[in-house]
């Protein structure tokens, strides 16, 4: 008996069914590194239009977390997809290396500077620590398949970068944006330094909530203002509300809104001044039963009326400020210019000076009556005692409210006026210019524009000075008496920058002023001891990196991509500095992603046990699963992750991998140079499959171009699961396995599979980089083929249907519907035990005239499309079964006639009629011993 198995074209490939990614990926990475893949990509893109994504530097401290993974994977997907779209995409990763978190870590290792160790040694220890942290994070980023110039990253502590940061400061000064002043800034008592806006977090804190009386200096004058002479009884007070009693010693005024209506109100046995809209709420809060309005005036009528400070021997004026609202409180705002931005601004208009009572360590200075030497938060209770003692405390409660905290120490911070260096938002029209530049940028998602616009419109001047050891120094000299900058400041800055370029920032601290100032000036000028805000470091990388590095060819940055918290962080600082120095935004597009949460929408927290560690994912599942999860998510909102979600990504991965494996296995023995069939000679279904791939590719390219990666994944899954997996790949198995190996029927099919595989691997590469690289190595080799898929552009060999194709896409879409209806009835027949597999079935399709005419075009090949042994078409009028879910079609399933062919598994009535091949059907005889069956459609 003949063994017909050897006459079949069974699929065969070395491409494994299981990804085993955790094991295979490191070997691929080694190959990428050994062969300098990043450089190969760069060389392949020479001369093409550039696309520059400037990497926002993560902080060089600690292990990477899942948010880092999301950020870097999104960037990598963009860079790889832009390469495939025909761009030159240099990617230089970077790190933020100066600043407080590193100082704190190093202090824990070597002690504080100038105590156990010199400042110079401390800086070197910080540099060494940061370098070590960079190496650890770098290894993790590389493990995720991120391509970039990892051997030459930018570090803000690189000597040349430090020098460029100093030069950016010079441009800020040259353009007139820098000034020195005493203004309230966020001040961390633990850091002993000012904080940037982006270094402030808001957490719940329990604070005293107090209503405080400021007695009228001249009650008769107040009565007169309210046209309430002789009305009511008892003392008159202006009532303020605050949650920071410690700021009352610094009170210098009470702010009111000129447009609001204020009332003099009988409050029990006393009279108080309140804004009209809040009288009822204050009455309720204080617990006063009887209230009577004695008079009412606009706020502007009360300007400069005097009230007594609660416990100090001076009076404070009522001053006008638009910052006063009726959202809460009393409509009269306690104003301490040392401790609030609005307080400072409004006091400045009235030439009210600051009190200067709080020192750098957060304690009241020795000359502060009642509270000398007390820490500000410690003094709260003492202030309350004093208020009670003098009868000024109207009401005390304790409330939990949102309060600013230091991002590093997690401790409450204060607003405190200190002499600092600022970039002025109004100086040289910087604010207006920046607001104009925001409009020229594409913000993705679009709400980002309104967000940063509001932030820029309302932000205070930028305090860029810090009182730290590990940071880029503000390499300036100021006059000992006038505090003015040296007249040759710009020249000096450049001279120092050159020294820093050679020896790093320590060159400044080692510098003898005589070397740059000469002996006479060195006597009259001193070094500024401050360092720059680290947001100045990273914010100036548009100059220190993009403008400075040769691979960017002087091109401007196309995109910044970071988490949504960077609107007030890196996006803001970069915009401010670039506008101040270059007169334009540093980016053309800004893309933001949300924060990672668990599947219930909760933040990652060790206490909740919901933390997903990236390394654990790639060690167990592989980095490609992590990458697929990131790409599958709509990153514009919160990004949910959990083990269940990652398992779901794993299921999607297996579907894509299985599709790729099917393609590769069925390309066994196919040589494109020898076996490729011309499009016009291909079988109709194969031509349609290639046209489906072209349509999918167009959708995928558009989605990549618009950074809609979840759409890419959805389209990829639809193509693999629906158009290919449940239709085309199912149908072609019979033709692929049973026809002659070199027949047109089979080579046409393999041609389609080859085109599809060449396209599919490129679609996958930006997301499933490791798997795409693996697939690429198993594809049939073509002369001149690149070694890596990452140097390739999207496949150009796909083609669409033409007018010459009688069976157009609309036709095949109808066939898909017919097949879906047939499958539904076949499945029911399986459940009813009428048949086992579809090949045991004979289907009769009762169709209306339109559907019948369509089906008849396939002739005898309809059964191959339906994957049944027999298919008969009859008029709908003859149906003895009901119409199904497709109007105009009724499907009847019966057991197929004849016997099962052991070679093709189809049932046939002619088995045994062929002398030499008596055990197989006539079709198989033709494919084994004859010229081979002819196919036209499927």
From Swiss-Prot:
Residues annotated for ATP binding in this entry: 606
Cofactor: Zn(2+)
Record's keyword annotation contains Nucleotidyltransferase: no
UniProt binding sites for L-isoleucyl-5'-AMP: 562
Subcellular location: Cytoplasm
Disulfide bridge partners, by residue number: none
The keyword Protein biosynthesis is assigned to this record: yes
Function: Catalyzes the attachment of isoleucine to tRNA(Ile). As IleRS can inadvertently accommodate and process structurally similar amino acids such as valine, to avoid such errors it has two additional distinct tRNA(Ile)-dependent editing activities. One activity is designated as 'pretransfer' editing and involves the hydrolysis of activated Val-AMP. The other activity is designated 'posttransfer' editing and involves deacylation of mischarged Val-tRNA(Ile).
Matching PANTHER family: ISOLEUCINE--TRNA LIGASE, MITOCHONDRIAL (PTHR42765:SF1), SOLEUCYL-TRNA SYNTHETASE (PTHR42765)
Name the record gives this protein: Isoleucine--tRNA ligase
Organism of provenance: Actinobacillus pleuropneumoniae serotype 5b (strain L20)
